[in-house]
């Protein structure tokens, strides 16, 4: 019968040292292994990055659309300012005049805004500092369509406030809460022009 010599059996300290060295070697290989790191890091930052990028683009489009609407209102209001629009539509049904003026605004608007969604409000005021039009948004964040959308035919030498409003969709309001001003999450974009009409012949 043969017996294994105890000299061939590693001692406990030697075994622990061997295992520790193997563990350190494996840990070193793990640290040096860079495969898949980029994909993991990109996956961690991709969602917030693209959300922020989209929010920036959406804010820029909103500002651009607002400027486009302002330009359209300014260009169309010149015809009211000179009295040409009133004279050209003297025989037009009063219920259709607002639509006619909206068509004038749409001549200066690119495809950013759907023209048939634009609401028009034209009011005459007794004085500039003494009066101002009612806000088009109610206290609970609704578009006040009941009081917005009237057309008061401006005469000569009258103070006129022309407003156009359209709802613009907002998709990333969580990143920019101030982007939305309506309860449904959309933003009411407005274009305004205030002036005194010329003393045109009536």
Tell where the protein language model's regions lie, with residue ranges.
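Short, conserved structural patches
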Residues: 2-14, 75-202
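Alpha-helical assembly-interface signal, strongest on the long, hydrophobic N-terminal helix that forms
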Residues: 2-106
């Amino acid at each position: 019968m043969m017996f294994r010599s105890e000299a061939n059996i590693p001692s406990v300290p030697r075994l622990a040292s061997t295992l520790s060295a193997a563990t350190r070697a494996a840990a070193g290989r793990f640290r040096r292994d860079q495969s898949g790191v980029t994909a993991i890091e990109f996956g961690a930052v991709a969602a917030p990055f693209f959300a922020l990028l989209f929010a920036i683009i959406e804010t820029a489009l909103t500002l651009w659309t607002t400027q486009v609407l302002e330009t359209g209102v300014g260009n169309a209001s010149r015809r009211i300012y000179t009295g040409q629009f009133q004279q050209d539509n003297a025989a037009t049904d009063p219920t259709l005049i607002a639509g006619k003026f909206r068509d004038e605004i749409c001549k200066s608007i690119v495809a950013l805004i759907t023209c048939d969604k634009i609401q028009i409000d034209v009011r005459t005021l007794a004085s500039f500092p003494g009066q101002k039009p009612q806000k088009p948004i109610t206290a609970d964040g609704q578009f006040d369509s009941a009081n917005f959308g009237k057309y008061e035919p401006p005469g000569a030498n009258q103070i006129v406030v022309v407003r156009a409003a359209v709802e613009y969709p907002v998709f990333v309001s969580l990143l920019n809460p101030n982007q939305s001003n309506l309860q449904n999450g959309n933003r009411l974009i407005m274009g305004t022009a205030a002036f005194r009409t010329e003393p045109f012949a009536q």
